[in-house]
Design a protein with these regions (language model features):
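Glycine-rich phosphate-binding loop of nucleotide-binding enzymes
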Residues: 1, 133-139, 162-169, 175-184, ...
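Beta-sandwich/jelly-roll carbohydrate-recognition scaffolds of carbohydrate-active enzymes
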Residues: 1-152, 185
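Short, conserved secondary-structure transition motifs
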Residues: 6-13, 201-211, 239-242
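A contiguous strand-loop segment
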Residues: 20-26, 32, 36-37, 47-51, ...
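Carboxylate/His-rich catalytic cores and anion/metal-binding grooves
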Residues: 106-132, 167-183, 204-238, 304
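Primarily short, surface-exposed interaction patches in extracytoplasmic proteins
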Residues: 118, 182-189, 193-198, 284
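Aromatic/His-enriched, Gly/Pro-containing loop or helix-boundary segments
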Residues: 145-152, 193-211
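Active-site core of glycosidic bond-cleaving carbohydrate-active enzymes
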Residues: 147-165, 170-171, 212, 222-425
């Protein structure tokens, strides 16, 4: 009609996904001109005219669905049926303030502005993409109905397992079970837990299986709004049945990912997997699965196989047990696109990636003093790097410590384990 435009778009950037949309105007329009489609586009473009008097305001509402046009229309009818902009604005303000009020901080206005802006960023994902009837389009492009009525996506788990999801358990615990339920629904569809889910689809971006620490963290904190045995089956299956970026037969055969067999991200993939293994072991022990506990505890120690004692660096190793030579510790790589042994980093940044066994890592260095001295070198080396390919994610360099990228986020705290907590402070 002359108040509404509906459509369907298939987007193939990053993941192939479908958007059904409804655009509704509070005033009628007239199609003034129909423009031909631009290069590669299927739909024509429209120029619309609205008969607005001076001072009039045009209001526009948009609803989306991954399922169908009817889903988008139902969302608009249920969630925003009227045209009271101020009412919607005040309700949005109320809901955001409800979240912001969960944390009280002191400091300057500038510090508070930065803090609450970060808190806002925290809460804009994951996104509940289910329609009002609970339907959603899953990772296999089929339509499902969520058991809970919600389906969370935008799960960038390599980025968020370290601090974001643990913070959700504190600041928005009412959503945690729903997030895990969504991960389990993804598992039922794909046979493994989400790695990087966007609009319900699996992007296979980044490495590791970091839905595992998210689920185990919630379980150990007492969250039980999901089937615990199914959750354990999902984390165990994701750690034993090979899938993209997870070649468990190779990993178990060598005790690491050899760079001549796994030519991209071999060091980072090994280290990230050992942390996931530790998490599986923790849940196995809690559930009394002693055989699994022993198996995954052993795998969690695989990081030791890549610590080169001559350099005290995590270094690539081939299937014959030979270290990568030559070895440039400053060579940055975004290995998924350019090759190399590290993911968005270099040896200096990934050597510390043993969050689950810092004491064991210290022993490999030869004690706390040598460990702390190496940390000092990290922070005081020249802040430069030799790049291969796209490395813009590695930002905020302080020496070789990359404050702006996830693999470094825990590193400043490691002084606490070396008896020099004042350096962390």
């Amino acid at each position: 009609d002359n108040h509404t435009i509906t459509g369907h778009q298939v987007v193939e950037n990053w993941v192939k996904r479908q958007y059904y949309y409804v655009i509704s105007f509070d005033k009628p329009y007239v199609v003034r001109e129909v423009l031909p489609s631009a290069g590669g586009e299927k739909a024509k473009r429209l120029i619309l005219d609205f008969d607005l008097a001076e001072g009039d305001t045009l209001q526009v509402k948009i609803a989306l669905s991954s399922v169908c046009l009817e889903g988008a229309k139902a969302a608009l009818a249920k969630e925003n049926p009227g045209w009271d902009f101020d009412k919607i604005r005040m309700e949005a303000r109320r809901q955001w303030n409800n979240l912001f009020d969960r944390v009280k901080v002191t400091g300057s206005d500038e510090q508070k502005k930065n803090f609450y802006t970060s808190l806002y960023h925290l809460f804009i994902q994951p996104n509940d993409m289910a329609d009002t009837d609970g339907r959603y389009r899953g990772a296999d492009d089929k339509v499902y109905t969520s058991k809970t009525g919600s389906y969370y996506s935008t799960l960038s788990l390599w980025d968020t397992y370290r601090a974001t999801h643990p913070l959700y358990t504190i600041l928005s615990p009412e959503r945690v079970d729903g997030m895990i339920q969504s991960m389990l629904e993804h598992y039922r569809t794909m046979g493994y837990l989400p790695i990087w889910a966007l609009w319900g689809k699996e992007a296979h971006c980044m490495i590791g299986n970091h839905a595992i620490p998210v689920i185990v963290d919630a379980y150990l904190k007492g969250f039980r709004g999901f089937d615990v045995e199914e959750a354990y089956a999902a984390i165990r299956g994701s750690s034993t049945v090979s899938h993209q970026h997870s070649d468990w037969e190779v990993y178990d055969r060598y005790g690491y990912y050899p760079f001549d067999i796994i030519p991209k991200e071999s060091v980072s993939r090994t280290l990230e997997s050992t942390y996931d293994d530790y998490c599986v072991a923790r849940m196995a022990k809690s559930l009394g699965k002693e055989k699994d506990y022993a198996y995954f505890s052993r795998r969690a120690s695989y990081y030791k196989n890549l610590l080169d004692p001559s350099t005290t660096m995590m270094r690539g190793k081939d299937s014959k047990g030979k270290w990568r030579t030559p070895f440039n510790t400053f060579l940055l790589s975004h290995a998924a696109t350019s090759g190399g042994d590290y993911t968005e980093g270099n040896a200096w940044q990934y050597t510390w990636h043993v969050q689950h066994d810092v004491e064991g890592l210290i022993d490999l260095f030869g004690g706390k003093e040598k460990f702390a001295n190496k940390l000092v070198s990290l922070f005081f080396l020249e802040s430069s790097a030799e790049n291969t390919g796209f490395t813009q994610d590695v930002t905020g360099l302080i020496g070789q410590y990359a404050h702006g990228n996830e693999p470094s986020h825990h590193v400043a705290y490691l002084y606490n384990y070396a008896g020099q907590s004042y350096k962390t402070q």
